[in-house]
């Protein structure tokens, strides 16, 4: 299939940069315009878009359309890609998550997780980066539709506690989506910008950002003064969020169902489990504003209806360990920043899960009764801050962003392995970035010809307990007794939090370096190129499928329009019975063919429409020649866009608005109706 470019060819190129909050469960996009941030709604009018991608026998769906059909197609609807990105298949968090996912995750090359789905009748494997790139592409398209321009540049946010490989993988996802990722920034830092942008000139303020989303949790402590945002410390858990609370509620309901129905276990039925999860998520949201919520699902499993009422107290009891755990990183950042809780001027809540009353209560109690700030929208704050940072990086001249300076930190210590497997740290965690640090190392044995530089991140004393980022050899060291050669190792971490390591042997000047592109989560340039091409191919397929559906709808509209006219008494009187029979026979045959050929090609539908028109158009045009264009038109109207007849008639057999029966119906679809191909989406209703 011909490759289709990711952005619409008729859109003018733009140097506008957008900010994208790529979330575990929902994503959000914003743009800086007219001294403010516009959060951009999607084609459904929602300001956040589910981070869901679904594959069917005919098409690929992204966002709301994917989430709406999840109960019918759980095995091929992928979500939570952010919980896989940059991780290994064997990690305990991945293994535990897999128990809750209806889709299949397999181990690929170098233990990279691969998501298996069935798409257009074939089994396909996708990297988590590819799924995330599809969500990013959707956000890019939303922005392009809103701005009427092609977008290339973006700032994407990640949890502050994402490690190097997770950051790299997120950057790769942006590249696959056809974006130039100008910067990866930390979510709590972006939220701090949203909070502090219009609060200048009020002296130094210490702000604690508490960001609890759908899948990740971050706490950052910042000092804001005169437009300078300086991160003092950050902590968190890249695997804690609303999804975990949903899981607890789902497990409770599975056990409750088992108890009420003689041990029947619905946990092996992915459709039942998905329907239950959807209702549990709704109940969780309800419990943020009500003290109880009822979960009711008809015919949940083996024809059995299920109903249970969950109180807020019961929900809190189910998740209390998770809720309490959120205070551990709060204590950690205060300790790291050497600050007392009384010194925190403002606690800012970000992320949908901070709406849970118990979490708000725990934070209030921890800060001795201090009310948390709720002046920013918890769902949109991160995208808002990312959009501001995008404006700064694209050189926006407006006063509001010109004086703003962001000083972020690296969230994990970086170092290398020295004799005995010891972790020697070069850059301590919470060091302001960008940062550069050098240290001299030497050889361990006489006449050692080379050294192996192994780079790690983490806080443990021994490297075996930390995360290996990458390694390289420096060879060609001249023979010398141990401890004589001098090897200078430099760690250079850029503003994206991505690391370069260089080693130089001082006497010869021989050097080697590595940009940490870590096998653990990083794709090779060849893989990225392939995925970029695949993304364009899928995009082209989506466009092709849209045109196919439009052609089908056009044919269907035409047939039912003619059928309804022929059944009208006033029109019947103007035609011979043989003419009515000829038309009806042709239309009935085509409608029967349509019923059996829902997946026919665009060309087949168009050919069938021409066939119908060649039979019906001459006969239908007679009616209007008889009336000579009298008002009233087609009584009863035609489904899909001609309610109440067509005032003004149709002189000469033509219909206004591109509906000329003798010449066919160009463009598919009828004026006044829903655009062809965008018919109502069917949502699951329990």
UniProtKB/Swiss-Prot annotation:
Sequence repeats: 632-635, 636-639, 640-643, 644-647, 648-651, 653-656, 657-660, 663-666, 668-671, 672-675
Pfam families named among the record's database cross-references: HSP70
Family annotation (InterPro entries): ATPase_NBD, Heat_shock_70_CS, HSP70_C_sf, HSP70_peptide-bd_sf, Hsp_70_fam
Keywords of this entry: ATP-binding, Nucleotide-binding, Repeat, Stress response
Molecular function terms, GO-annotated: ATP binding; ATP-dependent protein folding chaperone
Segments of this protein annotated with the region Disordered: 657-686
Gene3D superfamilies reported in the protein's UniProt record: 1.20.1270.10, 3.30.30.30, 3.30.420.40, Actin, Chain A, domain 4, Substrate Binding Domain Of DNAk, Chain A, domain 1
Amino acid composition bias (Gly residues), ranges on this chain: 657-676
Family classification: Belongs to the heat shock protein 70 family.
PANTHER family reported for this sequence: HEAT SHOCK PROTEIN 70KDA (PTHR19375)
Record-given protein name: Heat shock 70 kDa protein
